[in-house]
């Protein structure tokens, strides 16, 4: 089968012809119909998430097939698989655990001590077929097609968890930093659907700002031409916001947007751009603000976002579909901030 693989850090991905894996036990072989392109794929190609090196620090073994936003049809199953049939259209939760560690036992499989992350340390979906390690991490699609469903397995699950951690309700105001991207447009929609909060979308390009507005943001700020803090103070009448979801966590965003928080506000840190956090500690105490990390999502988050999308409450904003051979171009678009919404590869 054709597969696009990371062979060497910092180099373009390489299209290879490799063997189709054979499922056994609880494994499922899926014929890939769509694979979303995520900014984590930029970090993988670069070989690091901030200062964390994927090989030396995270234990990734090369070569590896990228692609963790997965939807497709079941091709073959191991003898332990129940509840599914060949030909079923499924989405796959790529953030899997081995099942035995403390975090797996309490339902936080994405924090597993020995994780099985498809497209990271297990071969992913930039290929004609992908081997899913366990059938319990699948969702049988009834209304969504594969292209619509694939981004939900990362951008959807990640922002669903972040919105939950923000503790929103209709009295609250939320800032989404990076609101015009694949994660940002999902965060805006989920926050509206689940929390009913007032949403301020922030981005740095006019096209991205307009995309955030189409996603449902009540207010939008182009931080490249407007003073975001002044605009946030104006919108909130000086109070500040109840939560910020930072999908970048860059030096720039972390130096600006914590200052937008109201008392008892929450700063939800999602992005992996690798900046350090510098904040005057007494202000955390005096204003009772919280800095909260949020990493992808667990199986409950996966089921939650899939059901929300199948009910028509949210929908990924797919802006471009591309061929498998165009994977490097898609990642270039993200790396150079030329992408808005979500790009999806179709093998």
From Swiss-Prot:
Its cofactor is Zn(2+). It comes from the Archaea. Zn(2+) 1 binds at residues 38, 68, 154. GO terms for molecular function: alcohol dehydrogenase (NAD+) activity; zinc ion binding. Keywords: Metal-binding, Methylation, NAD, Oxidoreductase, Zinc. The modification N6-methyllysine is found at residues 11, 213. SUPFAM superfamilies: GroES-like (SSF50129), NAD(P)-binding Rossmann-fold domains (SSF51735). InterPro entries: ADH-like_C, ADH-like_N, ADH_Zn_CS, GroES-like_sf, NAD(P)-bd_dom_sf, PKS_ER. This is NAD-dependent alcohol dehydrogenase. It comes from Sulfolobus sp. (strain RC3).
């Amino acid at each position: 089968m054709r597969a696009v693989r990371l062979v060497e850090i910092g180099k373009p991905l390489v299209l290879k012809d490799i063997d189709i894996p054979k499922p056994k036990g609880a494994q499922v072989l899926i014929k890939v119909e769509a694979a979303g392109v995520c900014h984590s794929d930029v970090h993988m190609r670069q070989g690091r998430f901030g200062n964390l090196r994927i090989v030396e620090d995270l234990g990734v073994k090369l070569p590896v097939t990228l692609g963790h936003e997965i939807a497709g049809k079941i091709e073959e199953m191991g003898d332990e698989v129940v509840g599914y049939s060949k030909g079923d259209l499924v989405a796959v939760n790529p953030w899997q655990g081995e099942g035995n560690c403390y975090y797996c036992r309490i339902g936080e499989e994405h924090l597993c001590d020995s994780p099985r992350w498809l497209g990271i340390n297990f071969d992913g979906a930039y290929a004609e077929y992908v081997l899913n390690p366990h059938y319990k991490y699948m969702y049988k699609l009834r209304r969504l097609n594969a292209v619509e469903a694939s981004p939900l397995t990362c951008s959807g699950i990640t922002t669903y968890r972040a919105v939950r951690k923000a503790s929103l309700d209709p009295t609250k105001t939320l800032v989404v930093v990076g609101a015009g991207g694949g994660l940002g447009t999902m965060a805006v929609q989920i926050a509206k659907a689940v929390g009913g909060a007032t949403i301020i979308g922030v981005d740095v390009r006019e096209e991205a700002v307009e995309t955030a507005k189409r996603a449902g943001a009540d207010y939008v700020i182009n931080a490249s031409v407007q003073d975001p803090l002044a605009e946030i103070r104006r919108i909130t009448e000086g109070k500040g916001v109840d939560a910020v979801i930072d999908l970048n966590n860059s030096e720039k965003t972390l130096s600006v947007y914590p200052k937008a928080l109201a008392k008892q506000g929450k700063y939800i840190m999602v992005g992996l751009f690798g900046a350090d956090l510098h904040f005057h500690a007494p202000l955390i105490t005096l204003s009772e603000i919280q800095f909260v990390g949020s990493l992808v999502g667990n199986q409950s988050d996966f089921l939650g976002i899939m059901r929300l999308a199948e009910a028509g409450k949210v929908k990924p904003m797919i802006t471009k579909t591309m061929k498998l051979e165009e994977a490097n171009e898609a990642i270039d678009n993200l790396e150079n901030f030329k992408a808005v919404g979500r790009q999806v590869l179709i093998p």
